[in-house]
A protein has these predicted regions:
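Short hydrophobic beta-strand element within catalytic cores of glycosyltransferases
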Residues: 35-37, 288-291, 301
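Glycosyltransferase donor-sugar binding loop
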Residues: 36-42, 189, 216-232
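Nucleotide-activated donor-binding/catalytic signature segment of Leloir-type glycosyltransferases, i.e.
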Residues: 230-250
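Acidic donor-binding loop of glycosyltransferase active sites
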Residues: 260-274, 287-288
Length: 391
């Protein structure tokens, strides 16, 4: 099958990373897949580093007939069977193709409400299938926007269980940053932006430090929207007097090594998050997790069994959960062990891809059947003109 992915995002994060991994998996599995992204985006640079086939194309505007035509031309030349879109701009650009018969799917990877109900039009009438990251998204779309349940498929994110595993050296990253094995490391991995909750975690770190002055927090990820957000977080760290206890590492490719070094992973997201990849990575790496109640986190974490779950925007609750893991090694070990078992049962990347591919293949086959029926349908006979009689 030939699949074209479009990603209009200017920033690089978990969704964009996963899209590239999916494309690479498809190409390695005998299919053909490509990514169209904006030439000015971080996605282009990072995708090329991952070896993903990329086509630069301006995706800055929702409505651009020339770009829609260029997408159609690419599909025609490369015999694309289905288009996969991930956000509003790329979806609207592909709407003309869908209306002309090309199968189009729309991923929904965030839990933010659509706002006005008329924004559901593109989901209701502009795609063959919605692929949601979490059940909470499907529930919202059915109840709030009246979208038919059968139009929504829920397939959560997953990870490479070979890459993310407990086998990595726990001292590799610690040696790099000069932290001994006895120093607790609390890791937060994700883009620096308001919905990820880094400010809440900085406040939680301040509270934790009152009881555990040796605790170190490691923030991994780049800021979206330029460097200003990173500066705000650095200022918050400075105001809290945590410069010696917080490391901001920027974007890193060696996440498995950082997870191996961490005593725990904290997901402090306030909203938006649907299916946190870092939760899967941490579970697969055998790390205990503290997470806020966002997206599919409550569907996965059983409090006190395979992790600790707290309410969003509650720095005190975050701090309490962190201190609980630091003070109760048996609890942390039990949660890590149960999380690892859960990951091996539910977070296999190959299994996720086969589920997504089954959805895509079904849509492609349905499209082909419609095309065959359309071509086979007999043309209605043309009525003979009435004879014109002379006066």
């Amino acid at each position: 099958v030939n699949l074209l992915h479009l990603e209009s995002s200017g920033s690089w994060g978990g969704q964009e990373y996963r899209t590239c991994l999916e494309i690479n998996w498809l190409n390695a599995s005998g299919h053909r897949a490509w990514l169209i992204c904006d030439p000015t985006s971080e996605v282009l640079t990072k995708a090329r580093e991952l070896g993903t086939p990329v086509i630069p194309m301006s995706l800055r505007h929702r409505i651009n007939p020339l770009v829609s035509f260029r997408i159609w031309l690419f599909c025609r030349r490369h015999r694309v069977d289905l288009i996969k879109t991930y956000s509003s701009k790329d979806h609207w650009l592909c709407l003309p193709l869908f209306l002309c018969g090309m199968p189009v799917t729309r991923a929904r990877c965030i839990t933010d409400p659509l706002g006005k109900k008329n924004r559901a039009f593109i989901y209701r009438h502009g795609c063959a299938k919605i692929v949601a990251d979490a059940q909470v998204i499907k529930k919202e779309f059915i109840e709030q926007y009246g979208i038919a349940p059968e139009k929504i498929e829920v397939i959560g994110s997953a990870v490479d269980l070979e890459k993310f595993s407990p086998k990595h050296d726990p001292m590799k990253f610690r040696r790099e940053v000069g932290l001994s094995a006895e120093i607790p490391i609390i890791a937060n991995i994700g883009m620096i932006r308001p919905d990820k909750g880094q400010f809440n975690l900085v406040e939680a770190a301040r509270i934790v430090r009152h009881q555990r002055k040796d605790a170190h927090f490691v923030f991994v990820g780049e800021a979206t929207g330029g460097r200003s957000r990173e500066k705000w977080v650095r200022k918050a760290i400075d105001r809290a007097g945590l410069n010696g206890n917080v490391l901001m590492m920027g974007y890193r490719w060696d996440i498995p090594d950082i997870l191996a070094a961490a005593n725990m992973v904290v997901i402090a997201s306030r909203h938006t998050e649907a299916s946190p990849i870092v939760l899967r990575e941490a579970f697969a790496s055998g790390r205990p997790v503290v997470a806020t109640r966002v997206g599919d986190v409550p569907e996965i974490i059983v409090h006190g069994e395979n992790g600790l779950i707290v309410q969003p925007n509650d720095s005190n609750a975050l701090a309490t959960a962190i201190l609980l893991f630091l003070s109760d090694a048996k609890l942390a070990a039990r949660c890590a062990e149960n999380g690892l078992r859960y990951a091996r049962e539910h977070f296999c990347f190959d299994r996720m891809m086969r589920a997504k591919l089954d959805v895509d293949l079904a849509l492609v086959e349905a499209s082909k059947r419609r095309r065959v029926r359309s071509e086979a349908a007999p043309l209605a006979p043309i009525a003979s003109p009435e004879p014109i009689l002379p006066d």
